[in-house]
């Protein structure tokens, strides 16, 4: 990547390491030194352009690396410049690697949640013209040495297929430990961190590991004091989270727009009405119009009035719709996953979510059962009219409660009819 300024003079070393201050490195003796602010502006331009190129290469809707994001996060960026070719005497940039420590909640191979703060690979890009020339490895290797970290100790923020191949080829990283977030960790991540799974050890596992283990210290920071198990949430914020907002608005705005054009395969018509293009708009027969008018004039049924008065939260259908949120979130997390395979374990999103999901499913099937029962589907014809005739107490709208009662009653009836006493 070329720039209209002297990259070669700006970055004297082949690999330059920048933190959130984006400070220009010391220049070679003898080179003219422009104003510091200009140099920083040049660095910001390079970071912005690299971020854009990386996003394009990864088909991301927006860059996840920019000067602004660098300045507002405690990340470190390794920039590799081209020392061989010197187009127009100004040098060129080959690529970059961005890393940073992040607090994550990761699952170990026993599916226990662990609060850790590993070094994460956040963004990585080598210019298309020089990929597969060993530059990525050179940059990665430099970072490993500088950060004093082993490849298996890293967490990778949604690695691209190319990066997965890269890690496999150069570092033999293949087997992943399934996670419920977008980070990928590999077998060996917990290698020297396994301790008895007591919660008191879990929170301090890193600081202890650093003292007790002879192998290189885990790239972890000291964590805050242990929190109650309930406080630990089974997700971790990815640097790419903000992209979700850009991709899809929240419910209900994310619902598919109404079809303006007819579907490719319209459902088969049940009658010939409307099939002829010559026919004008169909009007109902006069008796139907009269019927409709009489229905409009008909006052609401007293039961309906009573139900409306005792139901402050709107219709039950509406309430049921809003209760589906956890599934919606799960669906969203799947939608945004770059690799569906990583998220196949979302069903293990912690007991709480799983239970909630199961409860939802149960509620839904329960409500369907309930409709069948109230339909008078042959099971309990005497009950179909009864609940409508009386004003139900407010809590009777709890679908699960109703169905439980119905099931108990049915169970009792069955037992009564099948047993001789
Ligand atoms: C957390 C994240 O940052 S995810 C985003 C990662 N970045 C990208 O996907 C952007 C596009 N890709 C790239 O920029 C580069 O290919 C990188 C950064 C992944 C690797 O850099 P390179 O300089 O190409 O890597 P290097 O030459 O050292 O190693 C080559 C190996 O990487 C892998 N690799 C690189 N490019 C490809 C590719 N197009 N297809 C498949 N594997 C590839 C292969 O294992 C390859 O070995 P091989 O050529 O023997 O098959």
UniProtKB/Swiss-Prot annotation:
Check the record and name the PROSITE patterns matching this protein. Answer: GNAT_ATAT (PS51730)
Keywords, A to Z, come to:
Acetylation, Acyltransferase, Cell junction, Cell projection, Coated pit, Cytoplasm, Cytoskeleton, Membrane, Methylation, Phosphoprotein, Transferase
**Top enzyme category:** transferase
Site (described: Crucial for catalytic activity): 58
**What residue range is the signal peptide?**
none
Give me the ranges of the annotated region Disordered.
Answer: 196-235, 252-284, 342-421
Q: In which tissues is it expressed?
A: Widely expressed with highest levels in neuronal tissues. In the brain, expressed in the cortex, cerebellum and hippocampus, including the pyramidal layers in CA1 and CA3, as well as the granular cell layers in the lateral blade (suprapyramidal portion) and the medial blade (infrapyramidal portion) of the dentate gyrus. In testis, mainly expressed in the internal cell layers of seminiferous tubules, where spermatocytes and spermatids are located.
Question: Where does the record place the N-acetyltransferase domain?
Answer: 1-190
Report residues binding acetyl-CoA. Answer: 124-137, 160-169
Record note on what altering residue 233 to R does: Strong reduction in tubulin acetylation, no effect on tubulin-binding
Q: Does the keyword Phosphoprotein apply?
A: yes
Impact of altering residue 244 to R? Answer: Strong reduction in tubulin acetylation, no effect on tubulin-binding
Location (main, coarse): cytoplasm
Annotated Low complexity bias: 209-221
- Asked whether the keyword Amino-acid biosynthesis is assigned, the reply is no
UniProt GO BP = alpha-tubulin acetylation; dentate gyrus development; microtubule cytoskeleton organization; neuron development; NLRP3 inflammasome complex assembly; positive regulation of NLRP3 inflammasome complex assembly; regulation of fat cell differentiation; regulation of microtubule cytoskeleton organization
Q: Which Pfam families match?
A: Acetyltransf_16
Catalytic activity as recorded in UniProt: L-lysyl-[alpha-tubulin] + acetyl-CoA = N(6)-acetyl-L-lysyl-[alpha-tubulin] + CoA + H(+)
Q: What is its EC number?
A: 2.3.1.108
The segments labelled Required for AP2A2-binding in the record are 308-387
Entry GO CC: axon; clathrin-coated pit; cytosol; focal adhesion; Golgi apparatus; membrane; microtubule; microtubule bundle
Q: Which domain of life is it from?
A: Eukaryota
Bias (Basic and acidic residues): 226-235, 352-372, 412-421
- Family the UniProt entry places it in: Belongs to the acetyltransferase ATAT1 family.
Partners and quaternary state?
Component of the BBSome complex. Interacts with AP2 alpha-adaptins, including AP2A2, but not with AP1 gamma-adaptin (AP1G1/AP1G2); this interaction is required for efficient alpha-tubulin acetylation, hence clathrin-coated pits are sites of microtubule acetylation.
> What protein am I looking at?
Alpha-tubulin N-acetyltransferase 1
Gene name of this polypeptide? Atat1
